Amino acid sequence: MAEPLRTHRVVVVGAGIAGLTSALLLAARGLDVTLVDKAATPGGKMRQVMVDGAPVDAGPTVFTMRWVFDQIFAAAGATVEEHLKLQPLGVLARHAWRGHEPRLDLFADIRRSAEAIGEFSGPQEAQRFLGFCRQARQLYDHLEGPYIRSERPTLGSMVGDLGPRGLMALMQIGPFSNLWRSLSRHFRDPKLQQLFARYATYCGASPWMAPATLMLVAQVELDGVWAVEGGMHAVAKAFSALAEARGVKTRYGCGCEQILVRDGRAVGVRLAGGEEITADSVVFNGDVNALAQGLLGDPPRRATAAVAPARRSLSALTWLVNARTSGFPLVRHNVFFDEDYASEFDDIFRQRQLPRRGTVYVCAQDRTDEGIGSDAPERLLCLVNAPADGDRRPFDHSETDPCEQRSLALMRECGLTIDWSPQTHRLVTPANFERLFPATGGALYGPATHGWMSSFHRASSTSRLPGLYLAGGSVHPGPGVPMAAMSGRLAAETLMAHLDSTSRSRRVVISGGMSTRSATTGGMA
């Protein structure tokens, strides 16, 4: 490896999955990498909280797109199997509706899902489901390269990369339509429309404003959903351990107060205690709005555009639970639907209030496809979508208690009873998320994916400030653990490409007889 690569210093700010990925891959390429995070442990949103003596995963709960992690570990000279224990789930999710029997399971086996839908909604809906899955597969196959793997896709580059067949597949789903309208063409049963419309919330969006292309989430789940031994926080710990083994210097419990800028480029960071760490490049794994609002200093404001509050994605009320349950056969992922799905998103995005008929998602963290085999307390994450207004109001008990009681009532009407007490659960509100992740209002998915052009409006890994690179769920390709990991990979690849380009150009200059500065003190293009 050339000397400039061995001596190039990088500071990664934020140890979410994107920052961990960038740090790991850059260190694996031989760069001098320091990773800082204000939290005492790695993971960002993939954190754990102690509830009545047990650690409960408090953030993302779904492990999909395993190929993303396989490729990242391979690039670092390791395998996922060496660091994580994964169990494929046969049941992707169990769905229930207020006052409605039976329940509906979706399976990793598409034929089993079709059979279940046939029993639930009739044979014609089962055939429509298979057609829906075929279209989702085609859409995913066409968009994976031009969009997910691309550093900065534009409408023009997408059109060119898709080619005639890809464009035809895209036009068949009605790309200018919203997800709900598209689903109404696929399914007649409103409960199936409601079930698959929930895919919009994976990006923090409303099905009535999200683009129809989000139907590709169906294919992501069909490609596999895994349970991680130790929970999703174990993924962060595995990344951190491998990064340290590859030479990354981790500084947990050290918040970044300012990104240092000199001569128009990022040159390091100042920690909350006043310590300065100089660097040739900085990777910022945090919400881009923190930069735009000047929370990392005034000079980095210009690095990216601000996200207006109206463009924020969903936040949530989450209850972290360690309690006994009864009456409902929970699996790993469970969804309890209320009636009038449209009102949930009208309440959140238009009325800016907690939903009066909110869907409740429950991750039963001690279960896979089967029960836990005892009446011992089990760890749950219960989630209801909420407006990202955590910087505008406190979300105190006068607002959250009625939502909590409505959510418990919905689960009871679907058959689930939880031993609920102040000791067995902890509530996290949008205001809490805002304090954990400043400048977001508590939004958990970056900008909302609303409108067919929204995917092109996300910041890319290359910021407007030379030497500063961006990674995370608010950055392309978007939210979710695998996509955020992909953004970290794209940031690392972009930084390396700039560094390689600069090294080559300097070698050309030197060969021409002109002097040049060391790559450790100069900038990258």
Curated annotation (Swiss-Prot):
Family according to the record: Belongs to the carotenoid/retinoid oxidoreductase family.
Record-given protein name: Hydroxyneurosporene desaturase
Keyword Lyase (UniProt): no
SUPFAM superfamilies in the record: FAD/NAD(P)-binding domain (SSF51905)
Domain of life: Bacteria
Keywords linked to the UniProt accession: Carotenoid biosynthesis, Chlorophyll biosynthesis, Oxidoreductase, Photosynthesis
The enzyme's E.C. designation: 1.3.99.27
PANTHER family: 4,4'-DIAPONEUROSPORENE OXYGENASE, PHYTOENE DESATURASE
Pathway membership, UniProt: Carotenoid biosynthesis; spheroidene biosynthesis
A Pfam family: Amino_oxidase
Single GO MF annotation: oxidoreductase activity
Phylogenetic placement of the source organism: Bacteria, Pseudomonadati, Pseudomonadota, Betaproteobacteria, Burkholderiales
InterPro entries noted in UniProt: Amino_oxidase, carotdesatCrtD, Carotenoid/retinoid_OxRdtase, FAD/NAD-bd_sf
Catalysed conversion reaction: rhodopin + A = (3E)-3,4-didehydrorhodopin + AH2
GO biological process: carotenoid biosynthetic process; chlorophyll biosynthetic process; photosynthesis
Job description of the protein: The preferred substrates are 1-hydroxy-neurosporene, 1-hydroxy-lycopene and 1,1-dihydroxyneurosporene, however the 3,4-didehydrolycopene derivatives such as 1,1-dihydroxy-3,4-didehydrolycopene, 1-methoxy-1-hydroxy-3,4-didehydrolycopene and 1-hydroxy-3,4-didehydrolycopene are also efficiently converted. 1-HO-carotene derivatives can be also used.
